[in-house]
UniProtKB/Swiss-Prot annotation:
Domain of life of the organism encoding this protein: Eukaryota
Organism phylogeny: Eukaryota, Metazoa, Chordata, Craniata, Vertebrata
Signal peptide region: 1-23
O-octanoyl serine lipid modification positions: S26
Keywords tagged on the record: Amidation, Hormone, Lipoprotein, Secreted, Signal
Stated family: Belongs to the motilin family.
Protein name, UniProt field: Appetite-regulating hormone
Biased composition (Basic and acidic residues): 31-43
Amino acid sequence: MVSSATICSLLLLSMLWMDMAMAGSSFLSPEHQKAQQRKESKKPPAKLQPRALEGWLHPEDRGQAEEAEEELEIRFNAPFDVGIKLSGAQYQQHGRALGKFLQDILWEEVKEAPANK
């Protein structure tokens, strides 16, 4: 007959195996998504403001804005966060390609959304 030590060890291993399986499935559970949304709702909305305008809007920061090279910062949230910093010259050079890239990505998401419903 099977010893009690073997039965206890099998029981312990099966419980540990179930814990591992539950940990793997929690990522897809609705509770995880709700917790993630609560975390995101606590964040203040990001300010989208070119740094060149900061000195104009806040005169006390004008010295810092003039010292730093003109930069443009673009951020948006999708299923993931994306942030891009470009200088004025880089934006002039790559602005159209970046705009087309973002339009293509966002347009694909709009096309896929009705198909998923």
